[in-house]
Design a protein with these regions (language model features):
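A short glycine/serine-rich beta->alpha loop
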Residues: 19-25, 59-60, 258-259
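Major-groove recognition helix of helix-turn-helix-like DNA-binding domains
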Residues: 60-78
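Polybasic low-complexity intrinsically disordered regions
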Residues: 20-34, 38-41, 51, 73-76, ...
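Basic, amphipathic alpha-helical segments enriched in Lys/Arg and hydrophobic/aromatic residues
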Residues: 227-287
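Alpha-helical architecture
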Residues: 65, 102, 174, 236-237
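DNA-recognition alpha helix
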Residues: 46-61
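Helix-centered, glycine/charged polyanion-binding patches within enzymatic domains
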Residues: 178, 182-249
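Basic, low-complexity segments
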Residues: 1-22
Length: 287
C-alpha cells in the first residue's frame, strides 16, 4: 500500500507545513511526523525509519532525517501534536459531516505479562484483556469527529461524555448497550444529537431513578419501524473498524515497541491518518 498511500499523505504534510513553523528547532514538526508515519505505515519502529536506506522505495522524503532519540523526545509533544491535529482536520474536512454518527470503542490489547504501567485490565471482545481502548465518534468522514485513547478499564460512558460535545452538527448517534446511561443521552442531546442504543425489555424507562427524557425518546423510537431500521445501520461501525485493519499498515494491536499511553495515542493517530488517506483515495478525494 506504500505506493498508493504515501504520496497523498506526504503531500498533505507539506501542505500543512507551509503554515506551520516552529522556532529554534533543528527539525520542523512535519519532518518528525513524516518519519513517524513512515514507520507506522510499514509497521516498523522509529529507529528503522530514521535510516535513509529504508526510504529507498520513494523520493518523497525529508532531505535530512533526525536521530531516533530526537523523534522519541518530541513526537508526543505539543508542537507535533498541533501539527498532526491540523493534518487530521484537513483530511476530515474533505467530506461533509453526516446526520448519522456512530459511537464505539476498539480494544488495543498488549501481552498479559506486559510491564507497561499505563496498560490496564478490562473487558475486551470475548472476555478480559490488558491494554488500551480507542474510543471514536464517526460521522461518515475519513476520520472520527472525535476520538480518545484510554486504558482499557476506563468506562465507555465516561469517555462518551467527553467525545460527544466535540462533534459538530445534529442528527442521531448509534451505539451499543454499553452506552445506555442517562448522562450519555443528556450529553448527546446537549450536542444536538439523539442517542439510540438497544434497550432492555420490557420495563425500560419505568425505573424510579432519574430517567433522561432523551432516553425515553430512544425507547419510543425503537418501538417503531423507523427507529429499528435506523439502529440497523450501526453495523457500519464493524465495517469501519474492519476496514481499518484490513490492509498493510492498518490499525491493530500496538506492537512491542509502542508502550505507554502517550506513545500508544500517537501511534493510533498515525494509523488513523493512514486509514483516512486510504478512504479518501478510494473515494477519489485525495487530490
Amino acid at each position: 500500500m506504500e505506493r498508493e498511500l504515501w504520496p497523498p499523505l506526504y503531500h498533505t504534510l507539506l501542505e500543512v507545513a507551509k503554515d506551520f513553523q516552529q522556532r529554534y528547532v533543528s527539525y520542523q514538526p512535519w519532518v518528525l511526523a513524516a518519519v513517524f508515519l513512515w514507520a507506522a505505515l510499514h509497521d516498523r519502529p522509529v529507529s528503522w525509519a530514521c535510516q535513509r536506506r529504508h526510504w529507498s522505495t520513494t523520493k518523497l522524503r525529508p532531505a535530512r532525517l533526525p536521530h531516533r532519540t530526537t523523534v522519541g523526545r518530541r513526537i508526543d509533544g505539543l508542537a507535533v501534536g498541533a501539527f498532526l491535529r491540523e493534518v487530521e482536520r484537513r483530511l476530515r474536512d474533505r467530506r461533509q459531516v453526516s446526520l448519522l454518527a456512530l459511537l464505539d470503542g476498539k480494544p488495543l490489547l498488549v501481552s498479559g505479562v506486559s510491564k507497561d504501567r499505563d496498560a490496564k485490565r478490562g473487558r475486551a471482545a470475548g472476555g478480559m484483556g490488558k491494554g488500551y481502548k480507542l474510543h471514536t465518534l464517526w460521522a461518515n468522514r475519513a476520520l472520527p469527529e472525535s476520538w480518545e485513547v484510554t486504558p482499557l478499564n476506563e468506562a465507555e460512558t465516561t469517555v462518551a461524555r467527553r467525545l460527544l460535545p466535540q462533534a459538530p452538527g445534529a442528527g442521531y448517534v448509534l451505539a451499543d448497550g454499553n452506552y445506555d446511561a442517562s448522562p450519555v443521552f443528556d450529553a448527546a442531546a446537549a450536542s444536538g444529537r439523539q442517542l439510540v442504543t438497544p434497550m432492555p425489555e420490557p420495563n425500560a424507562g419505568k425505573g424510579h431513578h432519574y430517567q433522561s427524557p432523551h432516553r425515553k425518546r430512544c425507547i419510543d423510537l425503537l418501538r417503531g419501524d423507523f427507529g429499528r431500521s435506523l439502529y440497523e445501520r450501526r453495523r457500519q461501525i464493524e465495517r469501519l473498524y474492519g476496514n481499518a485493519v484490513s490492509f498493510g499498515g492498518g490499525l491493530s494491536a500496538p506492537p512491542p515497541w509502542v508502550r505507554g499511553l502517550e506513545r500508544v495515542r500517537t501511534w493510533v493517530w498515525a494509523k488513523l491518518l493512514i486509514n483516512a488517506v486510504r478512504i479518501l483515495r478510494k473515494q477519489g478525494l485525495t487530490s
